[in-house]
């Protein structure tokens, strides 16, 4: 099973386990809600899919790496309590609440979400003293004498023994009480995630050329060499930040993330060439519609990997513009929705308060503060992905700027105050239109270059396919259109259908002994 399918299964399970009947009881009793056990190699993305699943299901998430805990923190600390049994006073040992269970209640209190996912990582790598506690947790859904609260779905994760020397096998009794999912690395599925997360284009194009280098764990005389999906993503974040700071990444730095000598050397060499192609071909000039004649001449002698790298660079430049347009859209939409609520609030202002100086700015400021508080609450609950969080933060920043403008205007009545805000929104709308026009112009310029340089070659197929697979590009084109994209995509689909029909025909002929 790949990680995408596992995520879907987790989401479906959460919805099924939290579904309620007509009486408000959980449709599947807690005793029949089997914990999910994810088994897969390290760095494959198990923790990240838990965050995504919780966010998409609208529930809280408490995540623990159990190898960081002792028996005392998992079970609780012992203390002596006096009891009377059969008329005789005795001292008995009880336990404080487990730190993990306490964290669940703390999360409920902080977020207001009463249902969620309790995720325990590396569950089969615990120490000998903690192993019985983990078995009890999976079998009985308790830590010590404290049960996991109702409405919390248990998901655990572990590594197969070939990846971790500390692994302890579960017995059949335990395995018969869980839902086990075995997860394997899958580059095409990971690339779907990488596109949506805007991972560095050099990494995506490199793995397109060298898919075998996506995930490897090799043991030799010098120790274990490895490269994982987590390593590529963390390296991507660093490369993007280095570029924004004008810093250069070298092989020594890459080895800190890609801990496989041969692959690190290979990617470092590719990254140097990638930057060289960006400068030699003038990617920004191409997207501005000013491609140099020398670029076309250089492509005539270029090998396929160089041509593919150039296509990746063009797509990266477009992706940046699509993302900027999407952010501008999201902020404008957020401000528009806020202004609709503001208009209602202005209309409902009591007459006696409407006479106070700057009352409109004060009301607007209070509403903005409420918006910021709501954003923080959703952020704490993990209900906002990165684009949604960025949009809300930028919206709040914009609203604070409007508040200052409203204060300076000292509007005497609601109509005047709202007119000031409407003018501010007009400026914001112009900025959104500018971002959209810039992205559309760059897309047209990219098609101009692709047609002149590659016509209908394999490079054009890659270009159109990547536009189709990119969430940002797909959303932008669906909203704003691009005639040439639709035409090339239509031709590509027709070619695929013809190829599929030919394959079916050949298979049918083979079955009947005609070939």
Model-derived regions: residue spans:
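Alpha-helical lid/collar subdomain of P-loop NTPases
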Residues: 196-352
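Terminal-proximal interaction/regulatory segments of ATP-powered molecular machines
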Residues: 300-515
């Amino acid at each position: 099973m790949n990680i995408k399918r596992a995520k879907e299964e987790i989401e479906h399970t959460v919805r099924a386990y939290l579904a309620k009947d007509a009486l408000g009881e959980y449709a599947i009793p807690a005793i029949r809600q089997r914990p999910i056990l994810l088994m897969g190699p390290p760095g494959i993305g198990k923790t990240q899919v838990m965050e995504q699943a919780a966010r998409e299901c609208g529930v809280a998430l408490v995540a623990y790496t159990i190898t960081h805990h002792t028996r005392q923190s998992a079970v609780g600390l012992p203390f002596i309590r006096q009891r009377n049994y059969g008329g005789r006073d005795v001292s008995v040992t009880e336990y404080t609440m487990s730190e993990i269970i306490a964290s669940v209640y703390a999360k409920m209190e902080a977020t207001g979400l009463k249902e969620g996912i309790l995720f325990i990582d590396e569950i089969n790598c615990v120490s000998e003293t903690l192993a019985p506690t983990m078995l009890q947790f999976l079998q009985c859904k308790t830590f010590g004498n404290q049960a996991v609260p109702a409405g919390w779905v248990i998901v655990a994760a572990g590594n197969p023994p070939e990846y971790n020397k500390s692994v302890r096998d579960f017995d059949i009794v335990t395995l018969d009480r869980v839902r086990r999912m075995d997860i394997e690395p899958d580059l095409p599925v990971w690339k779907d995630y990488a596109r949506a997360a805007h991972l560095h284009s050099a990494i995506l194009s490199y793995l397109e050329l060298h898919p075998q280098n996506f995930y490897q764990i090799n043991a030799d005389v010098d120790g274990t060499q490895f490269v994982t999906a987590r390593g590529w993503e963390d390296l991507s974040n660093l490369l993007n930040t280095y570029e924004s700071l004008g810093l250069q990444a070298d092989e020594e730095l890459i080895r800190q993330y890609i801990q496989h000598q041969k692959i690190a050397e290979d990617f470092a060499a590719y990254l140097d060439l990638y930057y060289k192609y960006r400068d030699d071909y003038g990617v920004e000039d191409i997207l501005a519609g000013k491609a140099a004649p020398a670029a076309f001449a250089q492509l005539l002698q270029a090998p396929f990997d160089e041509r593919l790298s150039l296509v990746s660079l063009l797509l990266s430049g477009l992706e940046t513009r699509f993302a900027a347009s999407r952010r501008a859209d999201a902020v404008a939409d957020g401000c528009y929705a806020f202004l609709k609520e503001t208009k209602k609030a202005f209309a409902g202002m009591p007459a006696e308060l409407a006479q106070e100086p700057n009352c409109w700015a004060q009301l607007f400021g209070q509403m903005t503060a409420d918006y910021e508080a709501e954003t923080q609450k959703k952020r704490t609950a993990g209900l906002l992905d990165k684009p949604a969080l960025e949009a809300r933060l930028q919206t709040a920043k914009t609203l604070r700027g409007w508040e200052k403008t409203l204060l300076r205007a000292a509007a005497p009545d609601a109509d005047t105050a709202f007119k000031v805000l409407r003018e501010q929104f007009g400026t914001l709308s112009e900025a959104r239109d500018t971002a959209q026009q810039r992205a559309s112009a760059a897309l047209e310029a990219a098609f101009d270059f692709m047609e002149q340089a590659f016509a209908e070659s394999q490079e054009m197929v890659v270009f159109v396919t990547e536009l189709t697979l990119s969430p940002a590009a797909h959303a932008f084109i669906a909203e704003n259109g691009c005639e040439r994209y639709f035409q090339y995509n239509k031709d590509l689909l027709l070619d695929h259908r013809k190829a599929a029909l030919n394959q079916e025909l050949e298979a049918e002929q083979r079955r009947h002994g005609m070939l």
